[in-house]
């Protein structure tokens, strides 16, 4: 999304001035697999949050490799290093951005919290998010919402979601891919495992997709204007 707007630096300045706690977002040119693009970095208290690499496996479901899970970040109990939905809502309310943006961010967080509450069999008020994960996810969600508001698309068409496969390690132990919360959020949405082993769609990503999706399906006939 960032590559679709005319002035990236202006947007990043706006995002970093929104008051995201402990977070600084930056973007730099990057080359991966020979393709040039933009790498967006989220630094929490000076340390960059990184995603695990995924591996291409024909259809090798026999692989037992376990990947780290970065965006679930939830527990069904309290702790001083965790934030509940009430805490998250208060953080969002303090952001220096449009009220419509804040409302969308809160709604996306509610999707995640609702899915986690169903997975853990607890009330949504008992769901808590890890402190560092909360800062990282809040930056991801807020940035995406601000970009959607900047672009003002008439509709958002979502292709079938590739979830990945295998196993992922989180605070609760080793879980299947898609993680239980991701699977809950994607109920009723066209999905496939794909051929890349690892977690390709997190609860955060699934919540953003389902919240903004106007329709699901393969790419319709269209003319590309920006990539």
Model regions: which residues?
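Glycine-rich nucleotide/cofactor/substrate-binding loop typically near the N-terminus or early
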Residues: 4-119, 179, 187-206, 219-222
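Residues at or immediately flanking beta-strands
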Residues: 24, 126-128, 155-157
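Divalent metal-coordination and catalytic microenvironments
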Residues: 40, 136, 209
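Self-splicing inteins and homing endonuclease
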Residues: 41-43, 133, 161
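Alpha-helical transmembrane cores and adjacent cytosolic helix/loop segments
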Residues: 111-131, 135
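Mobile "lid/hinge" segments at catalytic clefts and subdomain interfaces of large enzymes
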Residues: 153-227
């Amino acid at each position: 999304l960032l590559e679709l707007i005319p002035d990236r630096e202006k947007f990043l300045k706006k995002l970093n001035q929104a008051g995201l706690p402990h977070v600084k977002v930056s973007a730099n040119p990057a080359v991966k697999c020979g393709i040039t693009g933009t790498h967006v970095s989220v630094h929490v208290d000076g340390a960059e949050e990184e995603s695990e690499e995924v591996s291409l496996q024909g259809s090798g479901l026999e692989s037992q490799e376990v990947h780290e899970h970065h965006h679930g970040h939830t527990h069904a109990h309290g702790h001083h290093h965790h934030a509940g939905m009430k805490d998250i809502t208060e953080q969002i309310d303090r952001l220096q951005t449009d009220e419509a943006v804040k409302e969308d961010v809160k709604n996306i967080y509610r999707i995640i919290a609702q899915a986690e509450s169903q997975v853990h069999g607890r009330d949504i008020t008992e769901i808590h998010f890890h402190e560092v994960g909360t800062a990282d996810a809040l930056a991801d969600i807020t940035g995406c919402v601000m970009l959607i508001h900047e672009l003002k698309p008439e509709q958002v068409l979502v292709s079938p979601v590739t979830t990945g496969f295998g196993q992922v390690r989180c605070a609760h132990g080793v879980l299947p891919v898609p993680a239980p919360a991701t699977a809950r959020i994607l109920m009723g949405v066209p999905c496939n495992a794909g051929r890349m082993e690892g977690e390709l769609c997190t609860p955060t990503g699934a919540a953003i997709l389902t919240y903004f999706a106007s329709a699901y399906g393969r790419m319709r006939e269209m003319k590309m204007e920006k990539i």
